[in-house]
Amino acid sequence: MPSPSLRHRFGHRIRELRLATGMTQEAFADKCGFARTYMSRIETGGANPSLDAIKVLADALKVDLSVLFTDI
């Protein structure tokens, strides 16, 4: 079986960090200013977020950008 794509691993990392904060996907999407459907696509690897969007994710999670890429 092929390894998960970078987008899927990144999305899983975002979901993992979001869940650690206790936020729902909808609350997290609102905090980021994204539609919930876009957030769902990020978390499932269906979207390829821009660098600006990745910075928004990090800020909403209150983590350094590098944390988003740890262990992916």
Question: Positions of the model-derived regions?
Answer:
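A detector for short, charged/polar N-terminal pre-domain segments
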Residues: 1-9
